[in-house]
UniProtKB/Swiss-Prot annotation:
It comes from Mus musculus (Mouse). SUPFAM superfamilies: occludin/ELL-like. PROSITE patterns: OCEL. This is Occludin/ELL domain-containing protein 1. Residues 100-210 form the OCEL domain. PANTHER family: OCCLUDIN AND RNA POLYMERASE II ELONGATION FACTOR ELL (PTHR23288), OCCLUDIN_ELL DOMAIN-CONTAINING PROTEIN 1 (PTHR23288:SF15). Residues 17-43 have a biased composition (Low complexity). InterPro entries: ELL/occludin (IPR031176), Occludin_ELL (IPR010844).
């Protein structure tokens, strides 16, 4: 005996997908994308370009980098030696005690004429030396007084005493490094040495003449 299913039973056998309607049914009923259905064709590997060999010391294009410049001052540079240095006479080096010019200009006296010339120079410059000696001596005495005053000052207990001590110290330093005073002092020392040298040369000549006269025999 065959049983034929009616329309109602056929509708009841439809699965849950058949019951969907509206947008969900439309989305689910879309066929798969064409690209997904076909398998992706394998790509052939690109042929590698032959790498050109370069020397090890030559950097590649990606290895180039700009190095920061080093700043060097002129006083840091070492003097370059000349390719053909000139020959100079033997350098004796700086002398610790240079010979004054008057010792070379006024050698030992050998005759009466030289003695008279040395004595004239001595008398001419002795007046200048005496005047400079007085001026330099007065300034040195003033400096000694200021220095003694600075050493005797107690520690300042007020701003007034501090200003007074600072004023005395400024006066002392001003007089001590005064260019005029330093020039006079140098000139005075130079003349003192020159006059002493002239006097010694004249005395040596006179002593030699006296000894010669004593040894002489007169008939």
């Amino acid at each position: 005996m065959q049983i034929h299913a009616g329309p109602a039973s056929r509708r009841g056998r439809r699965g849950p997908l058949a019951r969907l309607s509206g947008p969900e049914a439309t989305c689910n009923s879309r066929p798969a994308a064409r690209g997904r259905q076909r398998a992706a064709a394998p790509r052939m590997p690109a042929p590698e370009r032959p790498r050109s060999r370069r020397p090890q010391s030559q950097p590649g294009p990606g290895e180039l980098c700009v190095k920061p410049r080093k700043i060097v001052f002129a006083d840091e540079l070492r003097p370059r030696e000349p390719l053909h240095p000139e020959k100079h006479p033997r350098d004796l080096g700086p002398r610790l005690n240079p010979v004054p010019d008057y010792e070379l200009k006024y050698p030992p006296v050998t005759n009466r004429r030289d003695r008279s010339r040395y004595a004239a120079v001595f008398q001419d410059q002795y007046g200048e030396f005496s005047e400079l000696q007085r001026e330099v001596g007065a300034t040195q005495a003033k400096l000694q007084q200021l220095e003694a005053l600075l050493l005797s000052l107690p520690p300042p207990r007020s701003q007034k005493e501090a200003r007074m001590a600072a004023h005395v110290r400024r006066e002392f330093e001003k007089k001590r490094v005064d260019p005029g005073f330093l020039d006079k002092q140098a000139r005075c020392n130079y003349l003192k040495g020159k006059l002493r040298h002239l006097k010694a040369q004249i005395r040596k000549f006179d002593d030699q003449q006296d000894s010669n006269s004593e040894d002489s025999v007169y008939f």
